[in-house]
């Protein structure tokens, strides 16, 4: 691929980014778009501000960048939770390591590659991208020691940064456990596969079992019922309530001037009446009473939440095998109430292993089916073969600009469009597996999307050709390093264009929120719906973490092979830090989280990227007949594997299990302070399948908001006119208390 094609792709994507970021800085200042760009603040109780019409509202400004840059990590932790902090630390790690990599490789490796062979160089924009790769070095070149030394520096810096980040995040996770002393999940165990007995109900069987074997620690239990229809009806009713409760009777319930021809009712009065929001028509009823009126023993499922006196008791029960039959009395630590995926608790436990195998087969089959569009896309980068296959295209492809667009821009755009179908499908597969919580489902989807992305974007593209070739390329294990070494330099141009489109342009689309903006416009203009209640989104970790890791993989593998990509990746990571931080603070709401469990995924994938880079470099040193560089690369691979194993032994268990020492100290502190009895009283009503306001389960109550004691400032710090009571009434907004899950992006 020529540099001119890369410049064309870069110019198109830079223009898209500038236009979208400028539009965002204008649209976010419009009062009608507050529910799109400030959904999190509004839901968490921020007051809507009235902005008079003036010129500054229609002028782009970088104030949101300044705000995102100035927000500290402590403020972010209080506002969005540990997962958001861990994600941004992933971005910060990427900025740090690739700054080091870019300085080393651009300063030393790139000049060695460019002047690797005696040749007459053209102007830069007419050069081929392969001139800047290690492919340009001649066999037996003595300059390959520069690449080997750079590889050692990159690996050492990456491992050092990974160690400090792993240590810091492990401490943050322990602080997250101790800082949430009132979490009911720490006292609760989820029991599945309760044995069925024709003589008694599941509830009686469970009560008898735990009274017999855990009489000193067992408190009570809450059965899981098959009341999905009731849940849906109540959820719909609650959403309708949230829609109506923001309606002001004085404004929206004016007498109708049009006679009613259907019901014969009065035409000059309004029959619409808003009830008070006290207990929401269930005042005076206990949660258990309402549950028993809608559920019976026939609707009980073989799953329940069991509550214990101390956190340590719950931990022991969750880790111990309860029966000689491992398929009965299966125990897990319960997820948080708003993290429970109730639908999957109805699945019989004996079906789970079949579901996991089926979803694995489905995911692998989809990965291979995806070879078809990827192979077609790679054909677009090979114009010579394309013109031979389709002779009628030779005239069009002979035009320089069209040639540059097809080779430098179109393939990556088509690949991204195909990839939009991947995250929803992987989320569906993860739900079919039977995950007990939404956070586990999202983590599982994240891993699936990560594998899918690395396989199709990296391996399938660098080993481009027919589908048959994809299956035969790894026929010999010894050929893998050499095959990868030959293929990576040829795809360096494609990876750079993919960085432009999937990186820069995708970030600009992320901050614009085009789907939410269009939906808001349709609701206000087409349907004339002025309701400002907004169903907020959850941060899509299952799509953004794989994208981040993919670019890290591309950066490491191309660092000593084709370092021209590094400055563009560094720009992407810096933009990602500002844009994601802005979105987390203003748009996305945290209703549940994993407690930092995404970091081991990031750590392990980064180690994989380093080892893959070393294997590719080893293959290239072999192709270039440099035995010294090859000999020094093998110990580096072994040292990286040893470092990975040390981190797995030292830090990984903290992310898989809760330490008993910490939980016992928390139990003792609660017993001394007298809080334990109060916690026991709250346990039973927390894990209810029926959503009630009396449960205090609203997103407004659960999201911590560092701005809650302040009025929500205008994005440009514009002050409203004093004493404009009518405007405040018109633009007043109270947060949506339901905070229901937006499944399309959760």
From Swiss-Prot:
GO terms for cellular component: membrane. It comes from the Eukaryota. Residues 692-723 are annotated as: Disordered. It is found in: Membrane. The chain crosses the membrane at residues 3-23, 90-110, 144-164, 357-377, 405-425, 445-465, 492-512, 560-580, 601-621, 623-643. Its main location: membrane. GO terms for molecular function: calcium-activated cation channel activity. Keywords: Calcium, Ion channel, Ion transport, Membrane, Transmembrane, Transmembrane helix, Transport. Residues 692-702 have a biased composition (Polar residues). It is a multi-pass membrane protein. Residues 708-723 have a biased composition (Basic and acidic residues). InterPro entries: Csc1-like, CSC1/OSCA1-like_7TM, CSC1/OSCA1-like_cyt, Csc1/OSCA1-like_N. PANTHER family: CSC1-LIKE PROTEIN RXW8 (PTHR13018:SF117), PROBABLE MEMBRANE PROTEIN DUF221-RELATED (PTHR13018). Acts as an osmosensitive calcium-permeable cation channel. Belongs to the CSC1 (TC 1.A.17) family. This is Hyperosmolality-gated Ca2+ permeable channel 2.1. It comes from Arabidopsis thaliana (Mouse-ear cress). The gene is OSCA2.1.
């Amino acid at each position: 691929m020529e540099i001119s094609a890369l410049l064309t792709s870069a110019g198109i994507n830079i223009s898209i980014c500038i236009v979208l970021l400028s539009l965002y800085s204008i649209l976010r200042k419009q009062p009608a778009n507050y529910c799109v760009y400030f959904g999190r603040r509004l839901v968490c109780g921020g007051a809507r501000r009235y902005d008079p019409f003036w010129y500054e509202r229609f002028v782009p400004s970088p104030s949101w960048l300044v705000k995102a840059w100035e927000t500290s990590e402590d403020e972010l932790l209080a506002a969005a939770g540990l997962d958001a902090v861990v994600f941004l630390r992933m971005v910060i790690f990427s900025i740090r390591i690739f700054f080091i990599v870019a300085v080393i490789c651009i300063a030393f490796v790139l000049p060695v590659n460019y002047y690797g062979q005696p040749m007459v160089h053209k102007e830069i924009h007419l050069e081929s991208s392969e001139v800047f790769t290690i492919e340009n070095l001649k066999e037996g070149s003595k300059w390959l020691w520069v690449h080997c030394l750079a590889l050692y520096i990159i690996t050492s810096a990456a491992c050092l940064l990974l160690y400090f980040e792993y240590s810091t995040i492990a401490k943050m996770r322990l602080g997250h456990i101790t800082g949430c002393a009132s979490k009911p999940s720490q006292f609760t165990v989820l029991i599945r596969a309760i044995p069925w007995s024709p003589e008694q109900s599941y509830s009686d069987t469970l009560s008898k079992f735990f009274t017999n074997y855990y009489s000193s620690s067992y408190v009570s239990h809450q059965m899981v019922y098959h009341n999905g229809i009731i849940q849906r009806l109540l959820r719909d009713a609650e959403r309708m309530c949230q829609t109506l409760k923001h309606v002001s009777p004085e404004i929206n319930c004016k007498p109708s001037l049009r006679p009613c021809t259907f019901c014969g009712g009065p035409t000059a009065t309004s029959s619409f009446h808003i009830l008070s929001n006290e207990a929401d028509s269930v005042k005076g009823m206990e949660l258990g009473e309402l549950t028993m009126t809608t559920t019976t023993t026939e609707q009980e499922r073989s799953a329940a939440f069991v509550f214990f006196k101390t956190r340590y008791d719950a931990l022991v029960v969750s880790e111990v095998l309860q029966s000689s039959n491992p398929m009965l009395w299966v125990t897990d630590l319960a997820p948080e109430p708003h993290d429970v995926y109730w639908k999957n608790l109805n699945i019989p436990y004996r079906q789970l292993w079949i579901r996991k195998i089926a979803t694995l087969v489905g995911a692998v089959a989809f990965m291979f089916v995806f070879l078809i569009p990827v192979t077609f896309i790679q054909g677009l980068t090979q114009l010579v073969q394309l013109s031979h296959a389709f002779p009628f295209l030779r005239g069009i492809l002979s035009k320089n600009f069209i040639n540059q667009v097809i080779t430098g821009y179109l393939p990556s755009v088509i690949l991204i469009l195909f990839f939009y179908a991947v995250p929803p499908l992987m989320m569906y597969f993860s739900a079919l597996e039977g995950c007990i919580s939404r956070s586990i489902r999202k983590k599982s989807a994240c891993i699936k999307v990560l594998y899918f992305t690395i396989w199709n974007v990296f391996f399938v593209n660098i080993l481009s050709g027919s589908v048959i070739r994809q299956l035969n390329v790894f026929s010999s294990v010894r050929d893998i390093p050499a095959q990868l070494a030959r293929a990576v330099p040829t795809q360096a141009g494609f990876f750079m264009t993919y960085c432009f489109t999937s990186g820069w342009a995708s970030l600009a689309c992320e901050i614009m929120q085009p789907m939410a903006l269009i939906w808001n416009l349709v609701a206000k203009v087409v349907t004339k719906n002025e309701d400002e209640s907004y169903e907020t989104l959850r941060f899509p970790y299952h799509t953004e973490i794989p994208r981040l890791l993919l670019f890290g993989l591309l950066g490491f593998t191309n660092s000593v092979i084709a370092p021209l990509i590094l400055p563009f990746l560094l720009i992407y990571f810096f933009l990602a830090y500002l844009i994601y931080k802005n979105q987390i603070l203003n748009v996305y709401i945290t209703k549940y989280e994993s407690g930092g469990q995404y970091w081991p995924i990031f750590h392990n994938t980064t180690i994989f990227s380093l080892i893959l880079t070393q294997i590719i470099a080893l293959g290239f040193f072999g192709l270039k007949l440099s035995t010294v560089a090859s000999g020094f690369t093998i110990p580096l691979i072994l040292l990286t594997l040893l470092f990975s194993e040390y981190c797995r032994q030292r830090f990984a268990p903290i992310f898989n299990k809760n330490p008993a020492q910490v939980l016992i100290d928390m139990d003792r502190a609660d017993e001394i302070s007298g809080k334990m009895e109060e916690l026991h009283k709250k346990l039973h009503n927390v894990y209810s399948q029926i959503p009630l306001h009396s449960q205090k389960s609203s997103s407004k109550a659960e999201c911590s908001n560092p701005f809650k004691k302040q009025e929500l400032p205008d994005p440009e710090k514009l002050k409203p006119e004093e004493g404009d009571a009518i405007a405040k009434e018109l633009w007043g907004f109270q947060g949506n208390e339901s905070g229901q899950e937006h499944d399309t992006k959760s």
